[in-house]
């Protein structure tokens, strides 16, 4: 089997649902990848603690063991762009002005992603307020390109682009 972090979302969903891989194994693999790459790339910000991430994954495994799947994203770790609210995570907009404000509820599209079973574990870095051609802000700093560190990760969705390209 391909390394867990190299699977597409559809392949990962199938592997989780046919129980060839557990949600905990998936989370552990992605946390390992994040720990290896994110210090240099700075794609993900406001990452939940590994313990909280693994606890969510264990709960997802227990749901599957009981015959309950929330949907095709069940047990798959997901990061949300730091311009959108995800309950329990700060929505900073890449600005020090908003760093202490935690989201009280999910934005509608985030709620749909969560309802499909996704495990929201982090935010992706953005330029301040999502404005700018490069993902750099005073709060989290520069996001590097996941393929070529000498190139820009781009603006607005630079953190998301880097997270996907460096999988």
Task: List where the protein language model places each region.
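Short glycine/serine-rich loop/turn segments
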Residues: 73-167
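N-terminal Rossmann-like NAD(P)+-binding subdomain of aldehyde/semialdehyde dehydrogenases
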Residues: 41, 59, 84
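Solvent-exposed, non-membrane alpha-helical residues enriched in polar/charged side chains
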Residues: 13, 17, 61, 110-111
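Short, basic phosphate-binding NTP loop
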Residues: 56-58, 62, 138
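Immediate post-signal peptide segment of exported/extracytoplasmic ligand-binding proteins
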Residues: 60-77
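An N-terminal boundary/leader segment
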Residues: 1-56
């Amino acid at each position: 089997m391909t390394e867990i972090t190299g699977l597409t979302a559809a392949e990962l969903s199938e592997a989780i649902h046919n129980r060839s891989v557990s949600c905990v194994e998936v989370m552990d693999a992605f946390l390992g990848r994040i720990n290896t790459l994110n210090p240099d790339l700075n794609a993900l910000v406001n990452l939940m603690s590994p313990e909280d991430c693994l606890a969510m994954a264990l709960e997802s495994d227990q749901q599957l063991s009981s015959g309950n799947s929330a949907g095709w994203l069940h047990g798959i770790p997901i990061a949300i762009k730091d311009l959108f609210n995800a309950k329990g995570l700060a929505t900073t907009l890449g600005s020090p002005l908003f760093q202490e404000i935690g989201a009280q509820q999910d934005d509608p599209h985030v709620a749909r992603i969560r309802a499909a079973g996704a495990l929201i574990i982090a935010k992706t870095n953005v330029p301040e307020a999502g404005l700018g051609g490069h993902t750099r802000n005073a709060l989290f700093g520069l996001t590097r390109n996941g393929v070529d560190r000498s190139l820009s990760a781009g603006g607005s969705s630079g953190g998301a682009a880097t997270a996907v390209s460096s999988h």
